[in-house]
Design a protein with these regions (language model features):
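Phosphate-binding site recognition
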Residues: 1-201
Length: 201
């Protein structure tokens, strides 16, 4: 079954992946489907998915190393104590360097709250490590003002790096139009499937 209601967004992400080194910013209110969209996009790709929280920076680095360990199937990475984000991003760049891969940082603003210098750190990582190694970077967040300030604004260190951005809105109206154009039985099936997904969100 098609991924209901976000086919255009999926198409945009796939186009960015073809660039080899896309930098995508996705933002919008909570529970509009940002993470669901991203996970649908990366499910059949070489991807590193990291969900930031309000924990300390050291703990974030430790969990990020765990993501790298599981994705690269290198258990030794879990035993390393990383103190520099650049070293972690280098692991992403070095993994299958000739293949396209995706790095997702979900709830990006939490990392900025923990370390206000993180946008500068990420800018350096993108320019010096990630950009030329077939990495597509996705920054996602629900704190809209912080996403605009730290990922999109002119005075952000990340300004000028993005290749695409998405402001995701609720899709009720779009889905209503979609379902109204379907045969009745197909519409019922899709509404039932959509309801189950909403419950999981």
């Amino acid at each position: 079954m098609d991924f209901i209601g976000r086919t255009s967004e999926l198409a945009t992400l796939n186009t960015e992946l073809e660039r080899g080194s896309g930098f995508v910013v996705i933002y919008g209110r909570r529970r509009v489907g940002k993470t669901t969209l991203i996970k649908e996009f990366i499910k059949d790709k070489q991807a590193f998915y990291f969900l930031a929280t309000t924990e300390s920076e050291a703990q974030s680095m430790k969990r990020f190393a765990g993501v790298l360990s599981r994705t690269t199937k290198n258990p030794m990475l879990c035993k390393v104590t990383f103190t520099d984000w650049l070293d972690l991003f280098q692991v992403v760049a070095d993994d299958h360097p000739d293949e396209k891969k995706v790095l997702v940082i979900d709830e990006f603003p939490y990392l900025v709250k923990t370390n206000p210098d993180f946008p500068s750190i990420l800018q350096n990582a993108w320019d010096e490590v990630l950009k030329d190694h077939n990495v597509m970077l996705i920054l996602c967040g629900s704190l809209i003002s912080m996403m605009k300030k730290h990922a999109l604004a002119y005075d952000s260190p990340l300004y000028g790096r993005r290749t695409a951005q998405m402001c995701m809105l609720r899709r009720t109206c779009r889905l209503s139009r979609l379902w109204s154009s379907m045969p009745l039985q197909a519409a019922y099936r899709n509404i039932w499937s959509f309801s189950r997904r909403m419950n999981r969100w």
